[in-house]
């Protein structure tokens, strides 16, 4: 069972995003999709629904609503959480890293 989400360091999360996520994702409103979808407005949205992005059927079928907790569960091991996802990222094994990244994303994607 994944660790429960706890608010982390937004600053450390921003650094993690730059080093682990930015090559495939953007966060700003109107930002482009890259290899992965733009993440603006991701919290509260169901998986596989970012307009204009081509998702796998697995992402569309999962139908999870993204919250801090579901994002943490996903980021621990994306391919286990959504088998068939095209996200190549292996995951963040440390709960602290996930908490920091999600704290940043919760702010940066509003």
Curated annotation (Swiss-Prot):
Source organism, top-level taxon? Eukaryota
Among InterPro entries, the record links this protein to:
Cyt_c-like_dom, Cyt_c-like_dom_sf, Cyt_c_1A/1B
A single Gene Ontology molecular function, please? electron transfer activity
Q: Name one GO cellular component term.
A: mitochondrial intermembrane space
User: Positions modified as N6,N6,N6-trimethyllysine?
Assistant: 79
* UniProt cross-references to SUPFAM superfamilies, sorted A to Z: Cytochrome c
Which compartments is it annotated to reside in?
Mitochondrion intermembrane space
- Keywords from the UniProt entry: Electron transport, Heme, Iron, Metal-binding, Methylation, Mitochondrion, Respiratory chain, Transport
Q: Where does heme c bind?
A: 21, 24-25, 87
Is this entry keyworded Nucleus?
A: no
Q: What is the first-listed, main subcellular location in coarse terms?
A: mitochondrion
Q: How is it modified after translation?
A: Binds 1 heme c group covalently per subunit.
Q: Which family does it belong to?
A: Belongs to the cytochrome c family.
Question: Which PANTHER family does this one have?
Answer: CYTOCHROME C
Q: What does this protein do?
A: Electron carrier protein. The oxidized form of the cytochrome c heme group can accept an electron from the heme group of the cytochrome c1 subunit of cytochrome reductase. Cytochrome c then transfers this electron to the cytochrome oxidase complex, the final protein carrier in the mitochondrial electron-transport chain.
Task: Tell me the protein's name.
Answer: Cytochrome c
Gene that specifies this protein:
CYC1
């Amino acid at each position: 069972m994944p660790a429960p989400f706890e608010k982390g360091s937004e600053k450390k999360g921003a650094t993690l995003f730059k080093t682990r996520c930015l090559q495939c994702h953007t966060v700003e409103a109107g930002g482009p999709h890259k290899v992965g979808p733009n993440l603006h407005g991701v919290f509260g949205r169901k998986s596989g629904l970012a307009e204009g992005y081509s998702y796998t059927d697995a992402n569309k079928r999962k139908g999870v609503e993204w919250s801090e907790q579901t994002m943490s569960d996903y980021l621990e091991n994306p391919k286990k959480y959504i088998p068939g996802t095209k996200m190549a990222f292996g995951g963040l094994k440390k709960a602290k890293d996930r908490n920091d990244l999600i704290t940043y994303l919760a702010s940066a994607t509003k």
